[in-house]
Amino acid sequence: MTDRYTIHSQLEHLQSKYIGTGHADTTKWEWLVNQHRDSYCSYMGHFDLLNYFAIAENESKARVRFNLMEKMLQPSGPPADKPEEN
């Protein structure tokens, strides 16, 4: 019984500490945005992968990095409208 409580409290701690871990009310759109932003950050952080993208797109590394940062603003487009509950 104590293991279940410990795991639950650890999960709550992680969810409050880190943005991308989600919570019970996380929507599909929020989860997708977190995944895309995580991927773009990883691409920018790995020098060889950034070089690969720059060569494949025939752009400079700075331009590729700028484009990735621009994509991070709204990687999945605007959020879907929620239906109104009456």
Swiss-Prot record:
> Record's InterPro entries?
SF3b5/RDS3-10, Splicing_factor_3B_subunit_5
Ranges that cross the membrane:
none
Classification via Pfam families: SF3b10
Mind telling me which residues the site (Interaction with RNA) is annotated on? Y5, G20
Q: Give the location in the cell.
A: Nucleus
Sites where Phosphoserine occurs are at S9
- Is Cell membrane among this UniProt entry's keywords? no
Q: Which GO terms describe its cellular component?
A: nucleoplasm; nucleus; SAGA complex; U12-type spliceosomal complex; U2-type precatalytic spliceosome; U2-type spliceosomal complex
Any GO molecular function: splicing factor binding
Q: Mark the residues carrying the PTM N6-acetyllysine.
A: K17
What are the UniProt keywords, alphabetically? Answer: Acetylation, mRNA processing, mRNA splicing, Nucleus, Phosphoprotein, RNA-binding, Spliceosome
Kindly list the positions at which N-acetylthreonine occurs in this protein: T2
Q: Where is this region: Interaction with SF3B1 and SF3B3?
A: 15-76
Write down the superkingdom of origin. Answer: Eukaryota
GO terms classed as biological process: mRNA splicing, via spliceosome; positive regulation of DNA-templated transcription; regulation of DNA repair; regulation of RNA splicing
Q: What is this protein's function per UniProt?
A: Component of the 17S U2 SnRNP complex of the spliceosome, a large ribonucleoprotein complex that removes introns from transcribed pre-mRNAs. The 17S U2 SnRNP complex (1) directly participates in early spliceosome assembly and (2) mediates recognition of the intron branch site during pre-mRNA splicing by promoting the selection of the pre-mRNA branch-site adenosine, the nucleophile for the first step of splicing.
Q: What is the similarity comment for this entry?
A: Belongs to the SF3B5 family.
Subunit composition and interactions: Component of the 17S U2 SnRNP complex, a ribonucleoprotein complex that contains small nuclear RNA (snRNA) U2 and a number of specific proteins. Part of the SF3B subcomplex of the 17S U2 SnRNP complex. SF3B associates with the splicing subcomplex SF3A and a 12S RNA unit to form the U2 small nuclear ribonucleoproteins complex (U2 snRNP). Within the SF3B subcomplex, interacts directly with SF3B1 (via HEAT domain) and SF3B3. Component of the minor spliceosome, which splices U12-type introns.
Q: What is this protein identified as? A: Splicing factor 3B subunit 5
Q: Which organism is it from?
A: Mus musculus
Organismal lineage: Eukaryota, Metazoa, Chordata, Craniata, Vertebrata
